[in-house]
């Protein structure tokens, strides 16, 4: 039997799936090799741009007095876009994804910014939102 708190444990995979479903095809028109992942490492050949989406310490914010039911979770995800092409590619992909998170009622902080290490451009932002047990995404 699934826990009545399963919704809280599934937020990471749900948010990842929704964002990927909404943005992957539209981004593939401009970036045909784009790869979405939740894994920091892979044995396969690198594809660029790569979009790494990871949760950052989801936090229980409200529960019943007996601590049996989670009512509210503060969820933060970090999005990291890497490319070996141009700075603007990393930034554009990150900005499109940030807007998708905004459309899903997330707060963005910091806004997407870019850094370079070697030949790789990296754009990063974080998106945060509070989820209640009966919220729909």
For each predicted feature, which ranges?
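Oligomerization/assembly interface segments of phage tail-like spikes and tubes
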Residues: 68-85, 121-133
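Short, low-complexity, polar/charged sequence segments that are solvent-exposed and flexible
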Residues: 55-58, 70-76, 97-100
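Residues embedded in well-ordered secondary-structure elements
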Residues: 42, 66-68, 116
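Acidic-leaning, charged glycine-interspersed low-complexity segments
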Residues: 92-137
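Small/polar-rich, solvent-exposed N-terminal microdomains that initiate assembly or binding
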Residues: 1-64, 87-92
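Beta-strand-rich interaction surfaces with strong enrichment in secreted/lumenal proteins
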Residues: 4, 66, 111-114
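Short, positively charged, low-complexity/disordered linker segments
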Residues: 80-97
